[in-house]
Amino acid sequence: MKIINLDSKNLASFYVACELFKQIQQHPHAKLGLATGGTMTDVYHYLVNLLIKNKVDVSQVETFNLDEYVGLKASHQQSYHTYMNKVLFEQYPHFVKNHIHIPDGLSENLEAEAERYNNLLDERGPIDIQILGIGENGHIGFNEPGTDFNSETHVVNLTESTIKANSRFFDNEKDVPRQAVSMGVKSILKAKRIILLAFGPKKKEAISKLLNEQVTEDVPATILHTHPNVEVYVDDEAAPDCL
């Protein structure tokens, strides 16, 4: 595991955007694993600028999102479909629609949807670069503490801490979905390369646990120590004192 401590969120986001850009530029059939949330917004901003500036052909690129809330329409302002459209796919409208993959949180059979998405990952993968955030409780994707490390794409019951953390995006906490469809830990580890980002003082404890604890399901991110190609980008506020 390689730790990259940069001065600011903006600088770290730019570095990660450059890594995604290079993957697309050098490998036109790149398969990218994408994440959502405030941590990722600047990454996509810089990536879009690089794609526009260089007029990059992305028609063969495939994207696979980590997760989606259960119960939200794709058009809902807080769905991850809407997020991805706003920050990437509408900003650089050259990605092919059927190459964009996001779980369907409105499926009538969520278990079948999880299986469908998992089969898609197996058929179309492996993912070249998977980007990840980390929750304050050490979750990756929506794989909460206690998640089986052998889990593949599955339906997740969100913890109260995750619901509270995500409530800032909703009018009030009761509007936050209680479930999500998420890639499992085993699914994430199939990626050839993983880049995790963590910014701000609220992520400092999670990064400290990631770096200092043994591999444990109590801190899902610790499983990344078993992967041969992981980079962790942190800003000064998220960097633990040991760095």
Swiss-Prot record:
GO terms for biological process: carbohydrate metabolic process; glucosamine catabolic process; N-acetylglucosamine catabolic process; N-acetylneuraminate catabolic process. Keywords: Carbohydrate metabolism, Hydrolase. The active site is at D67, N137, H139, E144. It is an enzyme of class 3 (hydrolase). Its EC number is 3.5.99.6. GO terms for molecular function: glucosamine-6-phosphate deaminase activity; identical protein binding. Belongs to the glucosamine/galactosamine-6-phosphate isomerase family. NagB subfamily. HAMAP family: GlcN6P_deamin. PANTHER family: GLUCOSAMINE-6-PHOSPHATE ISOMERASE (PTHR11280:SF5). This is Glucosamine-6-phosphate deaminase. It comes from Staphylococcus epidermidis (strain ATCC 12228 / FDA PCI 1200). The lineage of its organism: Bacteria, Bacillati, Bacillota, Bacilli, Bacillales.
